[in-house]
Curated annotation (Swiss-Prot):
Component of the MAJIN-TERB1-TERB2 complex, composed of MAJIN, TERB1 and TERB2. Meiosis-specific telomere-associated protein involved in meiotic telomere attachment to the nucleus inner membrane, a crucial step for homologous pairing and synapsis. Component of the MAJIN-TERB1-TERB2 complex, which promotes telomere cap exchange by mediating attachment of telomeric DNA to the inner nuclear membrane and replacement of the protective cap of telomeric chromosomes: in early meiosis, the MAJIN-TERB1-TERB2 complex associates with telomeric DNA and the shelterin/telosome complex. One of its GO terms (biological process) is meiotic attachment of telomere to nuclear envelope. This is Telomere repeats-binding bouquet formation protein 2. Belongs to the TERB2 family. GO terms for cellular component: chromosome, telomeric region; nuclear inner membrane. It comes from Bos taurus. The gene is TERB2.
Length: 221
């Protein structure tokens, strides 16, 4: 599933989920070299350093909730779990997002919260690996197809994703208002290009010094 992919894990992520990542072919690296950044706590110092980094401010980095790995482990078809549903925003934004839309996908069932009680256990990892071998052997006998599906009997049968037509209301990824709820504008539209017409766009966290951000961005122009 994660063969050849590099992941960074915040200190808030359990050992079992890290072990699951490695068991599925992934490797653990530092945040600068990682393909994926995982955390279970937006307020953890490790995660805060990511949010405060220039890479994050310039939209070159995204933090995902590690509950994604738990969802994959419990899904009947592991490729059916959409990573985009598990974007973890900074803690300063979460309250407003919840107020407008509701709970995040990893909060929708307390029984499955990985930071509580339902982490992927060593026994589950063993079952997962054994099932993966059986599924691979079965597919080799049936087909040469390059598409790889993984089937296992979940520990608890549960739908780990929601229909796209309800996104993002059910999956709580962005917090953006629906286009259907926006007022219609009948005038002439023009593209907004940061840096033109005397305007610049900034993405700044509360903890970051605004002057330092401006100086770094001005050096680009």
């Amino acid at each position: 599933m994660f063969q050849g992919q590099r992941g960074w894990f915040c200190g808030s992520v359990s050992h079992d989920l890290r072990q699951f990542w490695v068991a599925e072919g992934g490797t653990i690296s530092d945040p600068r070299a990682a393909d994926f950044l995982f955390s279970c706590d937006a307020s953890h110092p490790d995660t805060l350093r990511i949010y405060q980094s220039l890479d994050y401010i310039e939209d070159n980095a995204t933090v995902f909730h590690a509950y994604y790995l738990s969802a994959v482990a419990n899904a009947e078809i592991k490729n059916s779990v959409a990573l985009g549903h598990f974007i973890l925003p900074p803690a300063s934004l979460q309250k407003e997002i919840r107020r407008k839309i509701g709970s995040f996908i990893w909060e929708q069932d307390q029984h499955f919260l990985i930071e509580k009680h339902d982490e992927v256990t060593s026994n589950e990892l063993k079952v997962f690996r054994e099932s993966s071998v059986l599924a691979t052997d079965h597919k080799k006998d049936l087909s040469k197809s390059t598409e790889k599906h993984f089937i296992r009997t979940p520990v608890v049968e549960k739908q780990m994703y929601f229909p796209l037509q309800h996104y993002p209301v059910n999956n709580m990824v962005t917090g953006y208002i629906s286009i259907d709820a926006m007022k219609k504008f009948l005038g002439e539209l023009h593209d907004f290009i940061p840096g033109s017409s005397g305007y610049l766009a900034y993405h700044v966290q509360n903890e970051i010094n605004m002057s330092a951000i401006k100086n770094k961005l001005k050096n680009k122009y």
